[in-house]
């Protein structure tokens, strides 16, 4: 509770500057969405994000909506969370994960069929709520014998970006009946 109150204090203190210069704050959720080593977690569910957004009720106070972080808890309904935070999502990390056990998951390719998350439904919710911020594929697996920083494979992130752009284009065309 102390950590949450300190965050609220900080956000309230900086909101006048954010208002003056049109700066959006986008807090990243806790990753994973459960306590680790006894450390407190304050942004890990719909209830947590709504509590924070309501306590600092300013359009510049928003979220980085990370599907991997929120999605690490299978009880989180990501589509519902996107609709609940409509207008307050300033940045999106969109990646797929595959549940492998209780509180266990691994990063998967972006296609819905390769993981446990419905990537189309997530992108559609962002589209339908008028999201117009940056979207990135977040982490990437190391594929095709790539040697790079673990978690940031260039090839997989490029494939993810192309996949997400394809979904966004289809949503655009569907909305215009093209």
Residues of each region from the PLM?
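Active-site-proximal, glycine-rich beta->alpha crossover segments in alpha/beta enzymes
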Residues: 1-8
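Histidine-acidic metal/acid-base catalytic patches
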Residues: 8-20, 24, 34-178
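Helix-loop segments that flank and shape redox-cofactor active sites
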Residues: 31
């Amino acid at each position: 509770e102390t950590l949450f109150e300190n965050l609220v204090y900080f956000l309230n203190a900086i909101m006048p500057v954010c208002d003056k210069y049109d700066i959006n704050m986008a807090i990243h959720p806790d990753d994973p969405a459960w306590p680790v080593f006894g450390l407190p977690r304050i942004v890990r569910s719909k209830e947590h994000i709504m509590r924070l957004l309501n306590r600092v009720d300013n359009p510049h106070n928003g979220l980085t909506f990370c599907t991997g972080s929120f999605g690490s808890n299978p009880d989180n309904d990501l589509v519902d969370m996107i609709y609940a935070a409509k207008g307050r999502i300033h940045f999106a990390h969109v990646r797929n994960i595959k549940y492998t056990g209780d509180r266990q998951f691994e990063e998967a390719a972006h296609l819905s069929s390769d993981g446990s998350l419905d990537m189309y439904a997530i992108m559609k919710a962002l589209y339908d709520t008028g999201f117009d911020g940056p979207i990135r594929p977040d982490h990437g697996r190391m594929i095709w014998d790539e040697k790079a920083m673990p978690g940031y494979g260039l090839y997989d992130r490029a494939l993810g970006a192309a996949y997400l752009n394809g979904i966004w284009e289809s949503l655009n065309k569907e909305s215009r009946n093209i």
